[in-house]
Regions:
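Hydrophobic transmembrane alpha-helices of multi-pass small-molecule transporters
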Residues: 60-63, 107, 175-180, 209-213, ...
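Small-residue-rich hydrophobic transmembrane alpha-helices
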Residues: 48-108, 145-159, 163-164, 262, ...
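Helix-terminus/linker motif at the lipid-water interface of multi-pass membrane proteins
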Residues: 27, 31-49, 118-125, 181-192, ...
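Interfacial/gating helices of multi-pass transporter permease domains
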Residues: 39-59, 125-130, 194-196, 236-243, ...
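Residue-level signal for short hydrophobic patches within transmembrane helices
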Residues: 8, 12-31, 35, 57-64, ...
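Short alpha-helical transmembrane segments in multi-pass integral membrane proteins
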Residues: 1-19, 76-143, 189-245, 301-366, ...
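Short runs within selected transmembrane alpha-helices of multi-pass transporters and secretion channels
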Residues: 69, 73, 138-156, 164-172, ...
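Transmembrane helical elements of multi-pass membrane transporters/channels
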Residues: 17-36, 137, 171, 204-208, ...
């Protein structure tokens, strides 16, 4: 298969062709996240709170799979752009093997730490029990999840975006269909409650894996997994981790942030913890499609950077920034106009709806400007510049928001936490612009 279209096709149709399947699959994935939470919320508000409490650890494991996958994606694209097919094959082979090893480690460690982790935030043993049950089932499929992401990034690196779209949509649809059946029961299928939600997630991931495996076996790809490359290669593995570790940290930092914010908000009421969890479910409907555009850009900037096409890299960055900002503008309008209705999808508690509506109207003020940070971070990852990308994420998730949330919470209560979000996005965008310009200047 010829992959030179990445440096010859006009930039706008090229980005659209690469990003649109990602945006569609991310929208479907966002819909799954919303629908899954809606079904869990119908069990009771306690179940929704349990999901909010386990979110940081679950997000951390997802961060490991996606972040290391970004390293795989960047290395394959860079080597293909430079015309080195063998190193691209080695990157793919080692990336898949290491991803599955990560999955095994996450299963063992994740199951072991969850009871103690949950008891740090609640004394309600029924909440702990629900959280442990859900995560134990989900974590047992960590190897499948890791393999899914390795395949996804490999297909994206060679421009096979429609394959990733089909695999992700099939898994999400399976999940959405099975959620009500396994949670509430149907015919001979018993009602499994929150365990049913976890099982539906696992079945969806397995369907995605089967589709990737089938497509890989039948497709003519410019990169292949080869048994002969399964031997130690410290130099190449170090490059995978040099990009993957900062990317993992980028994605894991929200887990650290949510854990920190849960600690602040739990001192006031569990309703605030629930609202934070609902917000993170809702914001995926914006950030995942925007991330779909960034995912489409990432292999393109990597390929063109490897091919010394720096002008095309700059055009791709500007176009991605504009499209991402447009998506975030839509989200801002929705949160300002129908915030109460959005929160009401997940809770019938009047107190939770009132708190959540106010939170959304404040937090959304930083949505549009956040496009600068997300685009800059994604472009830097595609260029193989993991450390500058990590600096941007540290600003967004640690250096600005944590001190601001703590100070403003002490001064204004929980409302101060919501204001910390948009202030952080404004400050981080300024830093991101400077960091990106300096990083790409070093060619």
């Amino acid at each position: 298969m010829n992959d030179t279209f990445m440096k010859t096709k006009p930039v706008f149709p090229l980005l659209v062709s690469m990003a649109l399947p990602n945006v569609i699959s991310m929208l479907v994935n966002s819909l799954y996240n919303i629908v899954d939470s809606l079904f869990v919320a119908r069990i009771n508000e306690q179940a929704m709170t349990a999901l909010s409490l386990v979110f940081p650890v679950q997000n951390l494991i997802n961060a490991i799979s996606i972040g290391f996958g970004i390293g795989i994606n960047a290395q394959i694209a860079l080597y293909l752009g430079a015309g080195d097919r063998e190193k691209a094959d080695i990157s793919a082979t080692h990336g898949m093997a290491l991803s599955m090893l990560h999955g095994l480690l996450c299963t063992v460690i994740g199951i072991a730490i969850m009871p103690g982790f949950l008891r740090r935030f609640t004394t309600d043993e029924s909440l702990v029990s629900m959280g442990v049950l859900y995560t134990t089932i989900v974590f047992l499929f960590s190897i499948v999840n890791m393999a899914d992401l390795a395949f996804e990034k490999m297909f994206q690196a060679v421009g096979r975006m429609k394959t990733t779209m089909a695999a992700l949509i099939a898994g999400c649809v399976c999940n959405i269909v099975l959620d009500p059946v396994l949670i509430f029961g149907l015919g001979p299928v018993p009602a499994l409650g929150i365990a049913g939600a976890a099982l539906a997630t696992n079945f969806g991931q397995f369907v995605t894996f089967c589709i990737y495996l089938s497509c890989y076996s039948t497709a003519d790809l410019p990169v292949r997994l080869r048994r002969k490359h399964l031997r130690p290669n410290a130099a190449l593995d170090s490059k995978l981790y040099a990009i993957g570790i900062p990317a993992i940290l980028n994605l894991a930092l929200p887990s650290l942030l949510v854990t920190f914010l849960n600690g602040l908000l739990a001192a006031f009421s569990q309703s605030y913890v629930t609202v934070l969890g609902i917000y993170y479910k809702l914001q995926t409907f914006l950030y995942l499609p925007a991330n779909g555009i960034v995912q489409g850009m990432r292999p393109l900037v990597g390929y063109n950077y490897g091919a010394k096409e720096h002008g095309r890299v700059a055009k791709l960055y500007r176009l991605t920034l504009g499209l991402s900002a447009a998506i975030m503008a839509v989200g801002t309008v929705l949160c300002l106009t129908i915030s109460g209705s959005l929160i009401g999808l997940f809770s019938s508690n009047p107190e939770t709806i009132a708190i959540g509506a106010k939170a959304l109207r404040i937090i959304c003020l930083g949505f549009i400007v956040s496009a600068v940070s997300t685009t800059s971070s994604g472009a830097l990852e595609g260029l193989g510049k993991g450390v500058p990308s990590l600096v941007i994420s540290l600003c967004r998730y640690v250096l600005f928001i944590m001190p601001l949330a703590w100070l403003l919470c002490r001064a204004f209560g929980p409302t101060g936490v919501w204001h910390a979000f948009w202030i952080t996005e404004v400050c981080s965008a300024a830093i991101a612009f400077v960091v990106y310009r300096k990083a790409v200047a070093k060619k």
